[in-house]
């Protein structure tokens, strides 16, 4: 009887410890922190959302990406540099923002860059240059972007997947 009881307990413990983790998506922005148990959990894929923000005046494509990943069966942390209350005049804010982005670009397992056609996006071009060789970047660039050919040629040269609109990229995630 004791052997049977130990067998049942061992089986239950193994089944609990081997249960797959539940799907989850977290969005992390500058000046925010993840719960400690999430930040230590290596089962999450970390994705940096690089690209057009235009001081918060552009399409909130980061929210669309979040919605898409929320529908998927996986565990994701989305690093989103877009701040709700961005204030470049606050002392130290620019340095904090740039370093936050650089740190999280390096930490990411994947970089999704979206450049809107109506934007100049000089920082996005800089980030693309820094990470094109990383093997972890996908670029979405609308054809009416004023430097589209530069982006297209660079993506081709380094083997970076290039999409012309967000919807085409999102379709690849299904």
Identify the function of each model-found stretch.
Residues 1-4:
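Positively charged n-region of N-terminal signal peptides that target proteins for export
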Residues 7-15:
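Bacterial N-terminal signal peptides
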Residues 18-174:
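Conserved catalytic or regulatory cores that recognize and/or transform ribose-phosphate-containing ligands
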